[in-house]
């Protein structure tokens, strides 16, 4: 790509007054990043069909000064947030549990049958909260999200997200649920570690919300579950959505609370925050409850940056905290990346769209050939470029 094109597309959005690259410096940075990738993979970043967006914040360990830079950020464009929605869902649940003086050994359960969404017959009525979080962050299971969705209730979730500064965020759909089943949430209770009920929550009917930033129609068609192709752009206005910058700020607020405004800090006690970060960094093979088969659930199974193109164990010095998501050809990763022996701390978020035929729900996406290799290589290239240019 010509330098002028880099200057036009390497765009950073203002964020909390943090230092920004100047235009030419920013363009040079992204040129160096993409030069560190294979030409075939780097080309995807410039292909408008892939809708690539990247946002990076970084600093030297121990510093309070973050710098940031972005590539092709398009904050008003809809994309499938997919399982990245589990990040704020988990943290909102932590707040509610902590507000009642409970810890991760609390048990969340229900006194009503499931309303909708993925909920296998083997799913327990009550589950220890730490186990729910573990299932979310190690292999990104869907039923734990649906458990917390019913626990929190739609209106309470959005009131808190708005108070935190995320008014356009939408947690309005259970995982694998018809769009009409999501405003109502079921009744249940929370027990302490001994099984004593500490508080109950009622069945609730929330406000029906939709995508807040304009139109959410995209693609060429949608294949219904019964195999009928519905031609034309699909309307995703009733799907979950979190802008890339918002999900990164949500992550930043849990990994480094002092670096965000007080109003954006999660109301999570420090001891619980440290426990949650340990869970978020856990690889599937390190999980004790549940135990996962490492042949099926390898380290890169639900982590795309750095290791998503390999089934090998991650390097022991590398630490990845965050959440990824994939659905309908959209791949997103939002991660905090550190490595023993390096003083670089990196918050990296990106997404890519890999759906060549433009048909949603047909399970024909280029995850393996384009998506996973691109995001893994991008993570390594950003890390390498920041280290080599001395921004650590």
Task: Please report, for each region that a protein language model flagged, where it lies by residue.
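Active-site-adjacent helix/loop patches that line small-molecule binding or acyl-intermediate pockets
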Residues: 26-36, 124-256
